Amino acid sequence: MLKIGPIELESRLILGTGKFENGDIQREAVDASETNALTFAVRRMNLYDKDLPNPLESVDLDKYITFPNTAGAKTAEEAVKIAEIARAAGMCDMIKVEIIGDDKTLLPDAIETYKACEILIERGFIVCPYIQCDVVLAKKLETLGVHAIMPLGSPIGTGLGINDALNLSYIIDAISVPVIVDAGIGSPSDAAYAMELGADAVLLNTAVSHAKDPVKMAEAMKLAVHAGFIGAAAGRIPKKYTAQASSPTEGLEFL
């Protein structure tokens, strides 16, 4: 069971809901993933006018934890405003704080993220900041009181996988709140690797929504996250640079 503040999730795969070709594929992929939590940009949602299109109208949101994010925010003030809009609309108080500091790389702004987290914690939100693989920042955010840390695997939408396994592992080893690897996952092996490193969960979107078969990829990601989690718990063998036979040597004298 994954626990983020008071929120409990059976699945360790969190799925983004954007970029799907149509609502039917979106719904089938969400079902295949067996996720418990769906994340979405609050700015994309039609929260008040039921006559306007809703990008999640094909999904039965009553079955899932809604995990709104502040995508589109450039400052702490904007992120806090988006979070308050989500709360006023009756969404879950768990918020992914995403504040982009560079439009080309879509990398997060550490300073504005910290400021936003400080305010949102004071206002009673369950705060999950999206950050670069910076263990110093992660530790400061944990001290501040965030409920999870969401370091990127690689820049959003690139599918480059885990680009900085060393610094990601530093974060995993250094903090006690859940670590959710977010962004850059491109394949099931990327998701499994994140979990093998010791992450508590994986959040992804493009890897599923832009796959040739999003429904099959959603199932593959579900299995990969589960396999990586079990593998990490089982404990891999240490790496060695000398060969060691796996077969016994007894009986060779009779050959």
Swiss-Prot record:
Gene3D superfamilies the record matches: Aldolase class I
Any GO molecular function: thiazole synthase activity
EC number: 2.8.1.10
A Gene Ontology BP annotation from the UniProt entry: thiamine diphosphate biosynthetic process
Keywords for this protein: Cytoplasm, Schiff base, Thiamine biosynthesis, Transferase
Record keyword Transferase present: yes
Protein name from the UniProt record: Thiazole synthase
Biological source species: Macrococcus caseolyticus (strain JCSC5402) (Macrococcoides caseolyticum)
Lineage start: Bacteria, Bacillati, Bacillota, Bacilli, Bacillales
